[in-house]
Each structure stands twice: as structure tokens, then as C-alpha cells.
């Protein structure tokens, strides 16, 4: 039962993010099948662009969504090989300093609601992207296409 609740919470988080991304008029696709049948939560702008090797990899963005990070954040590392920096949205307040350092080394950019940033170690707060900055980042890339 606990796993079903966690799964529902994860799906609910994805649906909330979809609503935000649609409101921001972002182009995205969910559950795109990538290498080795992996399915990142969100690919910006879409799966066709991801699979088109003439489309610049710099204009692709991958976002994983996890209600909590724990060790599961590593799942996003190999979900989209064309995209070197992965973005990870979480609702978890305060990830450990060691885990943040590992994420940073693995080129994972943490994305959280802006009010949550204060719960993270001060030395990493400037590396964490507020959700509103992330949507602006995606929009800026998409406006150049």
C-alpha cells in the first residue's frame, strides 16, 4: 500500500508540473522513450527533437520529478544520454550537503519551489534553481528555436 501511495504522489507531482508548464506555454513531452527504453519524466521541447540528431543537444532539457530524492535521484543520470546536465525537481526540503555535492559532480541541477531554497545548505543555495527560474530558462531556449 505504501508503494502505491508513493507512486500516486509522484504522478500527482508530475501532473502539477505539467499544469505549470502548460500555463507557462512551454513545449514539452512526458515519458519519451530514450536509450535502452528509459523514460525521463519531461523532455523539452519534445521526443522528436530528442531523437533528431540534427537538433542541437544544447537546446534539449531533461527534467526528472521526485517527491523526495533519497538515492532514487540517480535514476535520472542515464535517462537521456544526449543531455549532459539533468534537472531534477523535488519537494524534499533540505537534501544533505554530501548528496548535493554528489548531484553537482554528476551534473544534476536541483530545481525546487523558491521558498524551499532556504532549507538547503548555504554553500549550495546559489546552485539550486527555483522553479520559476527553470521555467524562464526553458522559455528562453524555446524562444530561440
Give the positions of each predicted feature.
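Conserved catalytic cores of phosphodiester-cleaving nucleases, focusing on short active-site segments
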Residues: 21, 42-69, 75-78, 88
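Short secondary-structure capping/turn micro-motifs that flank functional sites
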Residues: 36-38, 44, 119-120
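Short, well-ordered alpha-helical microsegments
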Residues: 71-73, 96-97
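Short amphipathic alpha-helical segments and helix-helix/interface helices
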Residues: 18, 76-77, 100-101
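Domain-level recognition of nuclease-like catalytic cores that cleave nucleotide substrates
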Residues: 93-145
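Acidic-basic catalytic patches of nuclease active cores, encompassing PD-(D/E)XK
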Residues: 1-38
Amino acid at each position: 500500500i505504501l508503494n502505491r501511495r508513493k507512486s500516486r504522489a509522484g504522478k500527482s507531482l508530475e501532473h502539477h508540473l505539467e499544469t505549470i508548464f502548460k500555463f507557462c506555454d512551454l513545449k514539452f513531452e512526458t515519458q519519451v522513450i530514450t536509450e535502452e527504453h528509459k523514460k525521463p519524466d519531461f523532455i523539452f521541447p519534445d521526443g522528436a527533437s530528442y531523437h533528431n540528431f540534427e537538433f542541437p543537444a544544447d537546446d534539449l532539457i531533461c527534467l526528472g520529478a521526485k517527491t523526495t530524492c533519497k538515492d532514487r535521484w540517480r535514476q535520472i543520470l542515464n535517462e537521456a544520454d544526449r543531455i549532459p546536465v539533468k534537472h531534477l525537481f523535488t519537494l524534499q526540503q533540505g537534501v544533505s550537503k554530501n548528496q548535493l555535492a554528489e548531484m553537482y559532480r554528476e551534473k544534476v541541477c536541483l530545481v525546487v519551489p523558491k521558498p524551499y531554497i532556504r532549507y538547503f545548505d548555504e554553500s549550495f543555495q546559489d546552485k539550486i534553481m527555483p522553479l520559476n527560474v527553470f521555467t524562464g530558462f526553458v522559455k528562453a531556449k524555446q524562444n530561440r528555436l
